[in-house]
Amino acid sequence: DHGRNYIEKKYKRPFSERIFRDFLSKTLPKPNIFKFLVLLSKFGKIFKFLMPKSLRSMMDLSPQKIYGKTLRFQNVYKAERKRPTARVALLIGCVQRVVSPQINESTIRILTRHGVEVITMPEVECCGSLNHHLGKEDLAKESFKKNIDLWYDEYLKNGLDAIISNTSGCGTTLKDYGFMFIEDKEFKKKAKKISELSKDISE
């Protein structure tokens, strides 16, 4: 990741590559925009032969189907027990929210069935890893700080036993928040706590 950031700053990529990477940076972390583009890509495949090679490859990777929701979206999912055993925040993500919403829904069902109250925070769109991996560190840090503030405020006001991720890349990034802000006086304490609370669903 340090290497990507260095390359992004020091190496001038070809114009077409810069445009493509900016496009990814501005669309993938935004679920509504990404969903619209996935739907649009179904029609765009008709004209795929007219597109640049990089765009054709991306069209081939676009999901063939967008799964419908089977669980009504809400901010709080109550535990299926009188006394909840824990209260957690679920990172519903950006790309996964569109491509595989059933993973989040299954996670919620399993947790609530076992007595865990689950909250979702729509304001947390992306963990920041997409821009982080693209070497766009300024945009990534905007997401990191926004998420840290939102979760930390919730932790202080209502309590959180964990922040759950069911996407390995996102989970790794959340656990790195503490390290990323270790020299930031304002965010050091908050980032460390968020990393400590972060758990993969398998944990």
Protein language model annotation of sequence segments:
Residues 2-203:
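Iron-sulfur cluster-binding electron-transfer modules in prokaryotic oxidoreductases
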